Amino acid sequence: MGVSVAYHLARLGMQNIVLLEREQLLGAGSTGKCAGGARLQFSSESNIRLSLESIDILERFEDELGQSIDFRQDGYMFLLSEASTLDTFRKNFELQQRLGVPVEWLDVDEACRRAPGITRENLRAATFCGRDGIADPNSVTMGFAKAAQQLGVTIEREVEVTGIGLDADRITEIQTSAGPIETRIVVNAAGPWSHQIGQMVATNIPVQPFRRHIFIADVPPDPKGLALEARTSPSTRILTIDFDTTFYFHRESTGILFGMGDPDEPSSFEQSV
């Protein structure tokens, strides 16, 4: 998020932009640990409008920034089992359509036809959007970073924000592990750490971090030497999410990527397996 903001501000003509990265490598936090999904299927108008802009950027990323990001628009499919979930998604579906999202409402037969590996048990309906997809997070980060630097953005690595200086209610500086930086404008692009940055200026940002696990299972080689593409349905490239259990999966390289949230997981920055 930080490199994207820096790049777009520089494109608009802003100068003296400094991006602070606490780690040695860009994207070493939640960005580098995510599954790379990008979707339009959200429940709030603001999220949908932002995502429409984001998908537009990803679709023209290579042409505009010269960086391949392996953006595959194979779609997201949400599987719906509970009656309450069905009602919520119907409202979301209507909002998404009103805002121009090419989302489809699928009955059970159509959902199973598009994703033959799923079970019909308890399934009531599904939603699908073909503009949703997956990109390589590292390539997106590096593409934005390189383009931002070409426009004059300074990127400081291994520099941690430790405080924000104020004069009355106006920002005067950023306090960092490498010393203060005078500024009157700060963009909080800290992701899961946004709440901690907000507290430096007595602002409550309602963001909480939760540990999640992603697994990748290799598919055994075929005795006849057939490639994975020839042995699996194209539907396995769809990022399929069982909304009520949070289980999701999609094909990843020569295997299957899958994950699931733990409803009892407490909020923390814990990253152990």
Roles of regions detected by a PLM:
Residues G27, G179-T236:
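Central helical "cap/lid" subdomain
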